Swiss-Prot record:
An example Gene Ontology CC term for this record: cytosolic small ribosomal subunit
Recorded family membership: Belongs to the universal ribosomal protein uS7 family.
Gene Ontology MF terms in the entry: mRNA binding; rRNA binding; structural constituent of ribosome
UniProt gene name: RpS5a
Pfam families: Ribosomal_S7 (PF00177)
PANTHER family on file: RIBOSOMAL PROTEIN S7 (PTHR11205)
GO biological process: cytoplasmic translation; ribosomal small subunit assembly; translation
Species of origin: Drosophila melanogaster
Cross-referenced PROSITE patterns: RIBOSOMAL_S7
InterPro entries reported for this sequence: Ribosomal_uS7 (IPR000235), Ribosomal_uS7_CS (IPR020606), Ribosomal_uS7_dom (IPR023798), Ribosomal_uS7_dom_sf (IPR036823), Ribosomal_uS7_euk/arc (IPR005716)
SUPFAM superfamilies: Ribosomal protein S7
Protein name as it appears in the record: Small ribosomal subunit protein uS7A
Keywords: Ribonucleoprotein, Ribosomal protein
């Protein structure tokens, strides 16, 4: 009986070896195909983030545009709002999109904000011929104030003191100023908000004083300089 059992075991074990080899080969082939044929992730199916550079070394960790943060759409369902300071890792285009949903009548209209950003990026590409992501990064770098003033003292004696601005607040304030400038320019104007946002980003990227964000940044830095 023992010999019969051994023969049965051998008959079941022998054909298993080539099957395992075939399965291993197919797994290796699928892994090779998946690693070599990964498609490039482009924003809205058009804009690549490979050639985008952040020239300000202090903001490189707070402007997320590298391949790791590449998305087809600027929407992550609030993933970066769960913890404090996690928004620093949020893709910069999504932060711009979320800032466009300001004022009560626009709350929660993410699809409308995505459409505005998409149209403004197409306008930027038509006017400049450059990657709109690079224009956005340059606009944020130029619009973030490096110095601000704060109130110091108690109720009786209050004075303003100039302070340096952290990199995260520079990015936050730059995005807010850019969106505010676009919103105010589009109010009671024949231009759409996508056109106004495109103009604001292009002027801010150039450092032009026609940009609302650049004017406000210069004003904040001028007040801070007088309070040193």
């Amino acid at each position: 009986m023992a010999e019969v059992a051994e023969n049965v075991v051998e008959t079941f074990e022998e054909p298993a070896a080539p099957m395992e080899a075939e399965v291993a080969e197919t797994i290796l082939e699928t892994n090779v195909v998946s690693t070599t044929e990964l498609p490039e992730i482009k924003l809205f199916g058009r804009w690549s983030c490979d050639d985008v550079t952040v020239n300000d070394i202090s903001l490189q960790d707070y402007i997320s545009v590298k391949e790791k943060f590449a998305r087809y759409l600027p929407h992550s369902a609030g993933r970066y709002a769960a913890k404090r300071f996690r928004k620093a890792q949020c893709p910069i285009v999504e932060r711009l999109t979320c800032s466009l949903m300001m004022k009560g009548r626009n709350n929660g209209k993410k699809l409308m904000a995505c459409r505005i950003v998409k149209h403004s990026f197409e306008i930027i590409h038509l006017l400049t011929g450059e990657n709109p992501l690079q224009i956005l990064v340059s606009a944020i770098i130029n619009s973030g104030p490096r110095e601000d003033s704060t109130r110091i003292g108690r109720a009786g004696t209050v004075r303003r003191q100039a302070v340096d601005v952290s990199p995260l607040r520079r990015v936050n304030q730059a995005i807010w100023l850019l969106c505010t400038g676009a919103r105010e320019a589009a109010f009671r104007n024949i231009k759409t908000i996508a056109e106004c946002l495109a103009d604001e980003l292009i002027n801010a990227a150039k450092g032009s004083s026609n940009s609302y964000a650049i004017k406000k940044k210069d004003e904040l830095e001028r007040v801070a300089k007088s309070n040193r």
